[in-house]
Every structure is written in C-alpha cells, then in structure tokens.
Amino acid sequence: MKTALEGLSKDQSQVLFLHMMGSHGPAYHLRSPKDQKKWLPECTVNDLGSCSEEELDNAYDNSVRYTDKVLADIIDTLKGASGMNTAMLYVSDHGESLGEKGLYLHEAPYWMSPDEQVQVPMVMWM
C-alpha cells in the first residue's frame, strides 16, 4: 500500500483496489499467520463438519482478527499520506455459515441463504 501511494500523483484523483481473501473458507486457518493466532485449537481441514464447533469458531475468529489488523494498517498508512485526501471502503462479497442450520461456507442459493451468508460487513473510513 505504501509503495502504491508513493507512486500516485497528488494532482489527480486516484482509486486503488485491494483484493483480500479475508475470512474465506473452508481454509480459515490459512487466512491468518501463526504469530496472529489468538484462539486455539483451530480447524485445519477442509471438511468443516468434522471439526468441533470450537475449532471452527477459533479458525474463523483468527481470520477475522487478522483482517481487522490489515484494515487498521491500511488506515494508518492512509493517515500518513500527506497532501492526499484519502478514504477507505471495505466490503465483503458474501457472509459465511459456520454450521448454523447445518450449513457451511456460502454456497446456498440467495433465495434460501440464511442471514449469515447474505448480510456482509462494510467499513468506511474517511
């Protein structure tokens, strides 16, 4: 992000897009580095139904926590972009089911998807 900002002209409006994997399953445990894991044990297999509720929640929560850290780092970088009017908008493309109603991930058709899959986070910083 810092490198991208340094290469931008301060005389023109610019938009940067950053694609993040965020809390995208089934491999939630791969979405946060080891030094950022707060909750253990984690589910480390793709068959989420074979994990305990605690393991699945821990892996997902660690991925959300790490996404929060990345977004905070981006905001700190944008705050330091002197001479630029900066803002950040974060939107997820879908929610995730973690076993609610026997569903996992986000593959149900929209018309029958539970709230966990269709209500998504959105964060704006200006």
List PLM regions with ranges.
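Catalytic domains that recognize anionic headgroups
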Residues: 1-126
